[in-house]
């Protein structure tokens, strides 16, 4: 987790990924992103909508290195960060998809595939649920995550 914190801190200087600018603040963000995971123990495959800095997807992947996790992020700079972090951390089971979740047209290959969907600060809960629903496999669930 410390390696991820270092990578995030380094990239955060160039492209704003998270609010905190120091390691302690980033560690707090990482721990905060894991709280729902620790309470609910998601099943896999997992889709993280609007992955941004990789929270909670990358910390979950660090704890479950063989878990099938897909990070969906629309912004190119952030997908570059995610690809770098995943490579640097050796998280070979994590995939990065550059694209938007859309209730009208989810990205190809994401429909009906996931047992769990996570997101942080993506949209209002109703909108987020509409985005997540098409991606969930029958019987799948999700963690909408806290909004700050």
Regions found by a protein language model. Give the residues of each.
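Class I SAM-dependent methyltransferase "Motif I" SAM/SAH-binding loop
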Residues: 50-53
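S-adenosylmethionine
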Residues: 57, 66-70, 74-148
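Class I SAM-dependent transferase core
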Residues: 1-47, 77-94
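Aromatic pocket-lining residues of Rossmann-like dinucleotide-binding sites
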Residues: 60
